[in-house]
A protein has these predicted regions:
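CRL adaptor-proximal regions
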Residues: 1-18, 454-471
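Leucine-rich repeat
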Residues: 2-210, ...
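C-terminal per-repeat helix/turn "cap" of leucine-rich repeat
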Residues: 45, 137, 161-164, 183-186, ...
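Conserved positional slot within leucine-rich repeat
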Residues: 56-58, 89, 117, 148, ...
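Hydrophobic, well-ordered secondary-structure elements that form the walls
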Residues: 317, 363, 382
């Protein structure tokens, strides 16, 4: 048996060795740094490929924490590698090596760099302590396809240089300081940009998006430390925009205006922290509809984060999206004394909600309080009226005993459902606000909010696994 396995491995090695060097080099370049280096042990022919294949140089916290001497290896790798460098990811303690970064970025080995990520290990609440982005980072503008900058001050020089990024497809700016003019200039120089993520940046009060290629935009605001932060986001002209992702329900901005986004399919998380939301000519103020005149037929996924089970607010949004397929409701914590107890909304068949007739197939309720009648009525409303509903997933924010779910089952089981095929799944878990969503750039995901449950830590501790209950 052992001899057969050894022969099989040898045959596989022979087959791979028949491939042209260019193909083998491409294979090596797709591997992580450690795995790529290990290919030298496969055969003699593979050994020179590692030094000539496109390099993915990833220096992360794990490596730096083991020994500071690894930092000294970076210039050695860059000087000795004979091939181009495709990716340079540096996650570092900025105080230890900031003065060296400029030299690394000036290396000829990085001349055709496609992906650059600079992420300081530490980020200070005081934005005055942020280091300026190394000027050498700007020299890659002609070739970069992916750029991620975290915890830097981006000087106005970026705007004055009118840099062009003809190949840039993904851009992430997180906890950076940058002026409005510099950011607008940077974005106007990205004719191929498909995804943009802006997280907790300072210096931008108003951002106007006008892009013919942008498909996904993720954003959130952090106002805890003062300064100028994003207060108004305007989608002026984005014909290809499919996703508008507010990554934190409490992370603003105060005003969002969607003027032209004819392909918008995924929107969320919406919350009352957004003081004013314009969807064409439809206006919401703190989740309350002021006017309902525009309908968006392209919208298929909506994520809403209300304070308590406010059916009126949710229904007003549903009226805007007649073809909605999936609804996620992430309840925010609220004192039980002011829950919407009288929230048993009556459905008027003469004025039906369009998405209830043919399209709404999935409803997910997170942080659900099954002991409160307002939450029970909230779930009942969809069971009684959504004719196309296939599944409803309900997650409690805490560990619950069997009796808790048995009580909910008894209240929901006997309902006369509009859709006889609707399945209800109950589980306990951890309070979840979906702030873990990190899929702004993953355009392959059909629904970036369709993620596995975190699970209940107490159930795992008791050896119960991820227990679910069906209704």
């Amino acid at each position: 048996m052992r001899t057969w396995r050894m022969r099989s491995r040898k045959r596989k090695r022979k087959k791979s060795s028949r491939l042209p060097d260019a193909v083998l080099g491409s294979i090596v370049s797709l591997l992580a740094t450690k795995e790529g280096a290990r290919t030298q042990a496969i055969s003699r022919r593979w050994r020179p490929l590692w030094r000539s294949a496109p390099l993915n140089l990833v220096v992360n916290r794990e490596l730096i924490n083991k020994t500071h001497k690894l930092i000294d290896l970076i210039p050695k790798v860059l000087s000795e590698h004979r091939g181009p460098t495709r990716r340079f990811l540096l996650c570092f303690c900025i105080d230890d090596c900031y003065d060296k970064i400029e030299g690394w970025l000036s290396s000829q080995a990085l001349d055709s760099l496609q992906e650059l990520q600079l992420n300081p290990k530490l980020w200070f609440a005081d934005r005055k302590k942020l280091y300026p982005l190394p000027p050498a980072a700007c020299r890659f503008s002609p070739t970069l396809r992916v750029a991620k900058f975290h915890g830097f001050h981006l000087p106005d020089l970026i705007g004055h240089l009118s840099l062009k990024f003809p190949c840039l497809e993904q851009l992430t700016l997180e906890r950076v300081t940058i002026s409005e003019d510099a950011l607008q200039s940077m974005l106007s120089g990205c004719p191929a940009l498909e995804s943009l993520e802006l997280k907790e940046n300072l210096g931008i009060a108003r951002l106007c998006i006008s892009s013919q290629t942008l498909k996904s935009l993720g954003f959130c605001v952090d106002s805890r430390y003062g300064g100028v932060f994003l207060q108004e986001l305007v989608i002026e002209d984005a014909p290809c925009l499919e996703r508008l992702l507010a990554l934190d329900p409490k992370g603003g901005p105060a005003t969002i205006r969607i003027i032209c986004a004819p392909k918008l399919e995924i929107l969320g998380m919406l919350s009352e922290d957004i003081s004013e939301l314009h969807l064409g000519r439809t206006i919401f103020q703190k989740g309350v509809a002021v006017s309902l005149t525009t309908k968006m037929h392209t919208m298929r996924v909506l994520v809403f984060s209300p304070v308590g089970p406010d059916l009126d607010a949710v229904v007003n949004f549903l009226k805007c999206f007649p073809c909605l397929e999936r609804l996620y409701v992430i309840f925010q914590p609220l004192s039980r004394a002011i829950y919407y107890i009288g929230n048993a909304r009556k459905y008027d068949p003469l004025h039906p909600i369009e998405c209830f007739q043919l399209h709404l197939k999935k409803v997910v309720l997170k942080n659900y309080d099954g002991e409160n009648s307002a939450f029970i009525n909230f779930a009942k409303f969809f069971l009684l009226n959504a004719k196309a509903l296939k599944e409803m997933k309900i997650t409690s924010p805490y560990h619950r005993q069997h009796n808790f779910f048995a009580n909910i089952q008894s209240k929901l089981r006997d309902q006369l459902r509009a859709s006889p095929d609707a399945q209800i799944e109950l589980r306990c878990g951890t309070r979840d606000y979906f702030t873990r969503n990190k899929h702004t750039h993953d355009l392959s995901m059909n629904d970036p909010f369709d993620m596995p449950s975190i699970g209940c830590w107490r159930c795992k501790e008791l050896g119960l696994g991820d227990t679910t209950y069906q209704v």
